[in-house]
Amino acid sequence: MSTKELYIGVMSGTSMDGVDCALVEFDQEQVRLIAHSDYPMPADLRQKLLSVCTGQATNLKQIGELDHRLGHLFADAVMDLLSQAGVDTSQIRAIGNHGQTVFHQPNGEFPFTTQLGDANIIATRTNIDTVADFRRKDMALGGQGAPLVPAFHQSVFALQDSTTVVLNIGGIANISVLHPTRPVLGYDTGPGNMLMDAWCETHTQQNYDKDARFALQGEVNEALLNTLLQEPYLHQDAPKSTGRELFNMEWLTAKLQGQNYRSEDVQRTLCEYTALTISKEVERFRYGPTPQLLVCGGGARNPLLMQRLQQQLSHWQVSTTDAKGVSGDYMEAMAFAWLAYRHLHRLPSNLPEVTGASRLASLGVLYSKA
């Protein structure tokens, strides 16, 4: 009897540059990416989401409408993937949908996290059971609700005699530390592409700095870099997580303190800032003769950022997850397909040593197609 099952993972990250979908085959714990797609996010929807995420005035009506629109967007993305792959909905066991994070507050008196994208709409429109709301049970157990992907990394990248660190550079950068003799660790190191993208969009009207062309026109401003490195989040102990609530244009504007920096120098400095905050954390976990850093996410396509990581981590073998046979562009979408698989099989999917939760738990809520 075949144990193979098909799941779809849907991910819209902090960069909000589109919806990543991954069609994934599971044969027990063996994982194989069958097909993938990028589905564009309408510009007006992205702008409305960005305004909510950066703390601009909103109301329940707007939040409800965004939740509805995103539900339809995610359903459209799933149907587009199935059409491209020539796969019928009846063949899919479930969808794992992350949703669009608009606020994440894991600390304080009332911790909470909010992801939009009505899973009822996804399930009924696609006629596929949908698992969503993955983060809040971990938070109910005292955890950060993030990061969740290290558990998937642990299942995919076998431990060897040296440390393997999986680095995802999305809007935020996060690491999964797979040590040969110690429990898995994982946390957000700080900004990934978020500040670079925001500054680039403000000054060049491009969503991101393609091939680091803008940054390469500038030079690192050491005074500004030192100011950025004073950010208290960087000095907190793990478990910890962050997002657009902290690292946004308001934060950056405050750090610039009205100084008249050249825009290209700021871009170059932000790239250096991202590289330094990542490499400082990665270097803490060097162990064994051949420690390796596997990079995934959009930042892996930034040649300047990758060059600086290689230079700052000279004792590490730096490559992408693609070199290990796992798509770096669809890693997170694959992870949420895996989380849906774990939910339906009633298997734990958080790592308390990563998130700070009090115990293991099967994450997510099932939204039935029926």
Swiss-Prot record:
One Pfam family, short name: AnmK
Pathway, per record: Amino-sugar metabolism; 1,6-anhydro-N-acetylmuramate degradation; Cell wall biogenesis; peptidoglycan recycling
Coiled-coil parts of chain: none
Reactions this protein catalyses: 1,6-anhydro-N-acetyl-beta-muramate + ATP + H2O = N-acetyl-D-muramate 6-phosphate + ADP + H(+)
UniProt keyword list: ATP-binding, Carbohydrate metabolism, Kinase, Nucleotide-binding, Transferase
Residues that hold ATP according to the record: G13, T14, S15, M16, D17, G18, V19, D20
Top-tier EC class: transferase
Species this chain originates from: Vibrio vulnificus (strain CMCP6)
Name this polypeptide is given: Anhydro-N-acetylmuramic acid kinase
GO molecular function, one term: phosphotransferase activity, alcohol group as acceptor
Gene3D superfamilies: 3.30.420.40
EC numbers on record: 2.7.1.170
Gene Ontology biological process terms from the UniProt entry: 1,6-anhydro-N-acetyl-beta-muramic acid catabolic process; amino sugar metabolic process; peptidoglycan turnover
Task of the protein: Catalyzes the specific phosphorylation of 1,6-anhydro-N-acetylmuramic acid (anhMurNAc) with the simultaneous cleavage of the 1,6-anhydro ring, generating MurNAc-6-P. Is required for the utilization of anhMurNAc either imported from the medium or derived from its own cell wall murein, and thus plays a role in cell wall recycling.
Entry annotated with the keyword Nucleotide-binding: yes
Family label: Belongs to the anhydro-N-acetylmuramic acid kinase family.
